[in-house]
Amino acid sequence: MSYPLEEVNKRRTFAIISHPDAGKTTITEKVLLYGNAIQTAGSVKGKGSAAHAKSDWMEMEKQRGISITTSVMQFPYNDCLVNLLDTPGHEDFSEDTYRTLTAVDSCLMVIDSAKGVEERTIKLMEVTRLRDTPIITFMNKLDRDIRDPIELLDEVENVLKIRCAPITWPIGCGKLFKGVYHLAKDETYLYQSGQGSTIQAVRVVKGLNNPELDVAVGDDLAQQLREELELVQGASNEFEQDAFIKGELTPVFFGTALGNFGVDHFLDGLTQWAPKPQSRQADTRTVESAEEKFSGFVFKIQANMDPKHRDRVAFMRVVSGKYEKGMKLKHVRIGKDVVISDALTFMAGDRAHAEEAYAGDIIGLHNHGTIQIGDTFTQGETLKFTGIPNFAPELFRRIRLKDPLKQKQLLKGLVQLSEEGAVQVFRPLLNNDLIVGAVGVLQFDVVVSRLKTEYNVEAIYENVNVATARWVECADEKKFEEFKRKNEQNLALDGGDNLTYIAPTMVNLNLAQERYPDVVFYKTREH
């Protein structure tokens, strides 16, 4: 058989989710260090460049070119090939972040142990729930003063509604941080500060009651560890592979990414427990990752901000089969066959032309405006993958033209940008406003600058009285007509002409939902 299943089975595709400042960039960097993808940590651009605010944002994009190198990184670890998908944090936050989570088989959740569960983490976890994605948890920043570890586990369980199974347990924190104890292996790994940029051998003490442990961490901390572990082992969950795969239980690791400690523990967990590339639901059937014929779907489109190169790169997750350079694929939505000879792969940060890729891998397709989010490519079969959602935006602005004669170009530009997933556009039924919706502020700046460079339309955005939006449907035609008649001032069409309810306040939305129980208000919609 020409299709090597061992290639598929050794792949692990995951994303990191966290609140800004929980240490995601540092972890990404340390993970690449362990995967031998970079030689010394400190080469992933992180906070140092955070001073680039909005004003020099275009310049920043030019420096980054397509910030594609940090979007997907592939590296070997243990006997696996790991694909790490970056989910932009901070101001880059957009629907892309959400959609990236639909293209992975597991996630690493990073929590700042001094702060606990934060708002962005909660939002991202909601998205992983759409597909019950398995979650591994890393409690970061133990080299600082942290909250009580038992309290942290309780918070994850109560707020994120997922059971915790601690795999390692911290000994002290802040200046007194001495290391972690591995519950399953009955070993203590001792921490040495100042080892952040390279990988050093760690001293291991075997056995919890080994007198060597008391010498290494001090009598008080050793005693405290034994007492805490009695409590923890009595009260917490054992790790169960089955519950983990269903997204009901998360293994928890403690460490400090900055001090390069504990990162290898969760990587071992990831390669050992995280699922290999999974099957995926399409409209007509389920596609298994072991199938020989190629199939894949586009989950993200990255625009290049360099006006000289209007290339955009469509990120495609390979679901089944093998991509080979120069192969002919069917672009199902438009029914055309295309030869793909210059797909990109992402080996450890280099943008290289792909010779081959297997299920679980991510490849980049050059897109000159024909590819949309959610598009499926196959080796001839007509099917469409489902589960690539649009999310109800949380921020809204009205877009206004400086030159009113360019209304047509503006609409064309906005619809194309919405197909690409850069922003969502809404046209109210009762006026000629154009309202754009996003989940991150930066998206508005992107839209205005791209309208100018790509469509030659000068536009500005201004505040608009919209708090939230929901897609609406109703099985009862008569009731739906009445709803539409009475709520016309709150209705709009989105970029794909789907009817949307635009609410000025959350109270208004809640009242509408109570008043019209037969109308369904959706927070997400299929692409």
Curated annotation (Swiss-Prot):
Q: Which residues form the tr-type G domain?
A: 9-278
Q: Name one GO biological process term.
A: regulation of translational termination
Q: So where does GTP get bound?
A: 18-25, 86-90, 140-143
The record's comment on protein family reads: Belongs to the TRAFAC class translation factor GTPase superfamily. Classic translation factor GTPase family. PrfC subfamily.
GO MF entry, a single one: GTPase activity
Q: Which InterPro entries match?
A: EF-G-like_DII, EFG_III/V, G_TR_CS, P-loop_NTPase, PrfC, RF3_C, RF3_dom_3_sf, RF3_GTP-bd
Q: Which domain of life is it from?
A: Bacteria
Where in or outside the cell it occurs: the entry states:
Cytoplasm
Does the entry feature the keyword DNA damage, yes or no? Answer: no
Q: Which HAMAP family match?
A: Rel_fac_3
Name of protein? Peptide chain release factor 3
Please provide the record's keywords in A-Z order.
Cytoplasm, GTP-binding, Nucleotide-binding, Protein biosynthesis
The role this protein plays is:
Increases the formation of ribosomal termination complexes and stimulates activities of RF-1 and RF-2. It binds guanine nucleotides and has strong preference for UGA stop codons. It may interact directly with the ribosome. The stimulation of RF-1 and RF-2 is significantly reduced by GTP and GDP, but not by GMP.
List GO terms (cellular component aspect).
Answer: cytosol
Pfam families for the chain? EF-G_D2 (PF22042), GTP_EFTU (PF00009), RF3_C (PF16658)
